[in-house]
UniProtKB/Swiss-Prot annotation:
Signal peptide, first to last residue: none
Protein name per the record: UDP-N-acetylglucosamine--N-acetylmuramyl-(pentapeptide) pyrophosphoryl-undecaprenol N-acetylglucosamine transferase
Lineage: Bacteria, Pseudomonadati, Pseudomonadota, Gammaproteobacteria, Enterobacterales
Organism: Yersinia pestis
Gene: murG
Binding site for UDP-N-acetyl-alpha-D-glucosamine: 15-17, 127, 163, 191, 244, 263-268, 288
Listed transmembrane segments: none
Classification via Pfam families: Glyco_tran_28_C (PF04101), Glyco_transf_28 (PF03033)
């Protein structure tokens, strides 16, 4: 297909941690003249989000098996076979030069279909420990990439593509220069909130008083309850919101962030150059722990496992950090970021298209 417009099929779905990095790479390649389509599922966030970015999307029918009953397990081979056949038809119609797998259930059937159609697969693992689908697809992928070291033994570490407005933030030494007053604590619960953060931070605010000021994003439906908790703690002066539309502005405001350690969050915190207290979601694979570990090892963050995340432990930690310490941690966070992750992933897609 030399001389013709190059075509990319992005496979990603389910969560923002899969979809947003895929969109970053898609836009980068579209700016270079590539044509991009998306493979997803009709009942997850990509169905509405991807078309908003001017990218056409095709759907296959597939869902996860974890936590499903015996009947779902028994019928899984049939459903996977049907999903692969659906994806094969889409691949034959679109004829992509390369398929980029960014994670989610759709990547399994989609990646196998691409391989059966002779289309090279570039795989990107966002988390510090590889998911089951990507571990399986790595055997047939043309190139395997990872955001954090350790997910695959021999894969290139390229980081996670993050939003350009976060990458454009001033370096910590510039952003934090001359700051005085209470330490600014940004609390990010995610779109669904994090109950442990919502329960604990009002008590931390009461413990530390005027030493800190908080901007607390509580998640969908949690605003009345958490606002009341701050009021009952005598801490009604903090900013408590359901969502934050401009995360770059929030990062720019903050001196330190308290949050879960999803792959994209960790990558954004590093790119912004922010110290962090990470509270990994308790999952049997411990993905979020492994995501946060490189920043803790770099001296840029502390990990507090959920059972140990108490008002006492958090208050003690925050009280031990002065502005000089926070600046040092911020600079270490920025030093381990990979700000050109989008370009690195895109370059591997281009390379795979040339060797196809």
């Amino acid at each position: 297909m030399s001389g013709k417009t190059k075509r990319l099929m992005v496979m990603a779905g389910g969560t923002g941690g899969h979809v947003f990095p895929g969109l970053a790479v898609a836009h980068h390649l579209m700016a270079q003249g590539w044509q991009v389509r998306w493979l997803g599922t009709a009942d997850r966030m990509e169905a509405s989000l991807v078309p908003q970015h001017g990218i056409e999307i095709d759907f296959i029918k597939i869902s996860g098996l974890r936590g499903k009953g015996l009947m779902a397990q028994l019928t899984a081979p049939i459903r996977i076979y049907r999903a692969v056949r659906q994806a094969q038809k889409i691949m034959r119609d679109y004829q992509p030069n390369v398929v980029l797998g960014m994670g989610g259930y759709v990547s399994g059937p989609g990646g196998l279909a691409a391989w059966l159609c002779g289309v090279p697969v570039v795989l990107h693992e966002q988390n510090g420990i590889a998911g089951l689908t990507n571990r399986w697809l790595a055997r047939i992928a043309k190139k395997v990439l990872q955001a954090f070291p350790g997910a695959f033994p021999n894969a290139d570490v390229v980081g996670n593509p993050v939003r350009t407005d976060v990458l454009a933030l001033p370096l910590p030494a510039v952003r934090l220069s001359g700051r005085e007053g209470p330490i600014r604590v940004l609390v990010i619960g995610g779109s669904q909130g994090a109950r442990i953060l919502n329960q604990t931070l009002p008590l931390v605010a009461a413990s530390l008083g005027e030493q800190i000021t908080l901007w607390h994003q509580v998640g969908k439906g949690a605003l009345p309850e958490v606002s009341q908790a701050y009021q009952q703690a005598g801490q009604a002066g903090h900013l408590v919101v359901e969502f934050i539309d401009d995360m770059a502005a929030a990062y720019a405001w903050a001196d330190v962030v308290v949050c879960r350690s999803g792959a994209l969050t960790v990558s954004e915190v590093a790119a912004a150059g922010l110290p962090a207290i990470f509270v990994p979601f308790q999952h049997k694979d411990r993905q979020q722990y492994w995501n946060a570990l490189p920043l803790e090892k770099a001296g840029a963050a502390k990990i507090i496992e959920q059972p140990q995340f108490t008002a006492t432990s958090v208050s003690s930690l925050l009280a031990s950090w002065d502005r000089a310490t926070l600046l040092s941690m911020a600079e270490r966070a920025r030093s381990v970021a990979i700000p050109d992750a989008t370009e690195r992933v895109a370059a591997e897609v281009v390379a795979a298209s040339k060797s196809a």
